[in-house]
Swiss-Prot record:
It comes from the Bacteria. One of its GO terms (molecular function) is carbohydrate derivative binding. Its main location: cytoplasm. The lineage of its organism: Bacteria, Bacillati, Actinomycetota, Actinomycetes, Mycobacteriales. The keyword Transferase applies. This is Glutamine--fructose-6-phosphate aminotransferase [isomerizing]. It comes from Mycobacterium leprae (strain TN). PROSITE patterns: GATASE_TYPE_2, SIS. It catalyses: D-fructose 6-phosphate + L-glutamine = D-glucosamine 6-phosphate + L-glutamate.
Amino acid sequence: MCGLVGYVGQRPACGVVMDALRRMEYRGYDSSGIALINGSAKSGNLTVRRRAGRLSNLESVLAEMVPASLAGNVGLGHIRWATHGRPTDRNAHPHRDATGKIAVVHNGIIENFPSLRHELEIAGVEFVSDTDTEVAVHLVAQAYCAGETAGDFVGSVLAVLRRLQGHFTLVFANADEPGTIVAARRSTPLVLGIGDGEMFVGSDVAAFIEHTRQAVELGQDQAVVITADGYRISDFDGNDDAVNARTFHIDWDLAAAEKGGYEYFMLKEIAEQPDAVVDTLLGHFTGGRIVLDEQRLSDQELREIDKVFVVACGTAYHSGLLAKYTIEHWTRLPVEVELASEFRYRDPVLDRSTLVVAISQSGETADTLEAVRHAKEQKAKVLAICNTNGSQIPRECDAVLYTRAGPEIGVASTKTFLAQVAANYLLGLALAQARGTKYPDEVQREYRELEAMPDLVARVIAGMGPVADLAYRFAQSTTVLFLGRHVGYPVALEGALKLKELAYMHAEGFAAGELKHGPIALIEENLPVIVVMPSPKGSAMLHAKLLSNIREIQTRGAVTIVIAEEGDDTVRLYADHLIELPAVSTLLQPLLSTIPLQVFAASVAQARGYDVDKPRNLAKSVTVE
């Protein structure tokens, strides 16, 4: 997601902070900003500059300023990936309070910001941005000016932290206490850098790796107060809590630091998938209802929908295939899933009661954008599922669900796919809620089950070592087949696509029931076949049929690699290699069963000596038809 840095020390903060932002550009961003405090030990002046677009835009603004206004030994910096509010100058960080004394930079999502903003507006606070971040700085200023924590900067920040809900990292500076920075984290990362007469905080060690190799990783719900001379770690109540932080020495070089210690960005992004799902879900269940990020459609209009089309390309298309199962099951609406590149050329039947769902990571995919425009011309209602706030597709749609996966550097999609799948569930529940096909308590129960998935995603990722070993064993195979049924079929398609993209191998995904209608002719001795097994609890019939398929291919000499839920002992007899996953409900299985296929493809590519992040002939955002 966003990248942030804080510095207090003896050097000019402007140069230190800007260097840190340049080192964090790899994270991806749509705007940037800096806050500097120049003054004595008792009071100072706060200067803030921020710009949408590339970091060079901010550099140009700073170059035009009087050097004296850039002086100061305390600074905050931020590169933003928009989640609340479009990527504009006024939504860029840092944000200030009304007095212009307190500044904040923020990574993550403040889930209860609508109610907090309403409270502040009633109190007369005027907001200048559309972000959730601005709520935090106004609350701190309010606490600092009056009440029990009046005049106590650290106490004011802690009091506000206790009120915030969500996942966030926040870093505050105050011109009235110019030698102090207060930072805190809940779930999103925050690392402290310990220098000689200077201190740093950052989203990751890339923010300060050129200046110090001594670091402290803050724990959950911890705050830190830093000055040039030292630091103090506490919980949100102000109690000493250094024991729950982790001190470590940074052995990586800068390139490794950018990748979080992983060899490739894609491996880092696979590891980030629990956070991608958490952040996509945050803030979408409020007051007992599923809410969209942007909604220009009334519940009445949603109730009038009588059919749904999902349009997408590549990996997003596979997430759309999964959306079909969810939406049809929960809403009883018919759903068609179309490749965006084919959609507008076949003259689909669309009208005012049609909902077209456009899924795109970048929000700029040319084929998907043209499909959206065709749907709008036919008076259909259009909803976007997108990872990039302010991109073209969301701007042209009637409603938007943002996948808050953050920037994805690897060309092959991983965390954005899981975030899209999570967003599809939210959409299905929102439609079921509007149409009355699920009672409120049923919607809440489904959402709570979805909310528990990130921990299981993390558990699966932690156990992927054997899958990587398996990949090296089959790295020289010429063909790999993938089989699945029901929601396992789109997962099989996605697994095959990943192997094609990354390892340049022939790979095909099939619905297992089609095996006897042709693909079984491909089965030969030692051919690896990966099977995505449904839960025996979800559908005993589907499970039995897929077991029969496995027996068919095994008797013809294929090597079976079976992905099945823990406790499914019936499959052990027919699996040459078994990958076990936690048991979840059928519709949620793709959030787990996709992960081994991502790891398998990346590991095969590594074993074959290919660049996992930059597969040949592919681009991250396809903006031509």
